[in-house]
């Protein structure tokens, strides 16, 4: 019998900027110039993926499914199409909500990869470290 706890992880994009307006402008800019042909290709090519189908269902309700969760990227690429968008505090709040629900690992990326990783490491990680200090010590 398995004695470990089973947890779950999430794959998300991050768009973290100093202001919420900058973050949303960048997020919308990621998909603003996608052609109808590109959107149709992504939709058709990955139609058999259950995970992609479920994300597209969410995206059909609107590009913003929660205060800081953007589905627009699903229109132009498969997988990892949901982005956490906002200021460092807003990004940390959104990820903290998932942590509090039991998410124990994240696979995060962004555009441009190195720049977003640097912003995340400097701005968001310190907030999450502080908020989860006790959890990290107990692990």
Predicted regions and their residues:
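An alpha-helical appendage that flanks or caps ligand/catalytic pockets
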Residues: 1-100, 129-139
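Short secondary-structure boundary segments
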Residues: 110
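C-terminal helical cap(s) of enzyme catalytic domains, especially alpha/beta-barrels
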Residues: 113-134
């Amino acid at each position: 019998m398995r004695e470990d706890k089973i947890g779950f992880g999430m794959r998300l994009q991050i768009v973290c900027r100093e202001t919420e307006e900058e973050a949303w402008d960048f997020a919308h800019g990621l998909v603003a110039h996608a052609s109808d042909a590109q959107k149709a290709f992504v939709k058709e090519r990955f139609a058999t993926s259950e995970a992609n189908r479920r994300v597209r269902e969410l995206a059909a309700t609107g590009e913003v499914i929660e205060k800081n969760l953007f589905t627009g990227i699903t229109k132009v690429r498969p997988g990892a199409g949901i982005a956490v968008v906002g200021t460092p505090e807003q990004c940390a709040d959104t990820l903290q909500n998932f942590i509090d629900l039991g998410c124990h690992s994240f696979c995060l990326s962004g555009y441009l990869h190195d720049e977003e990783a640097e912003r995340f490491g400097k701005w968001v990680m310190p907030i999450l470290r502080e908020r989860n200090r006790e959890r990290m010590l107990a692990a």
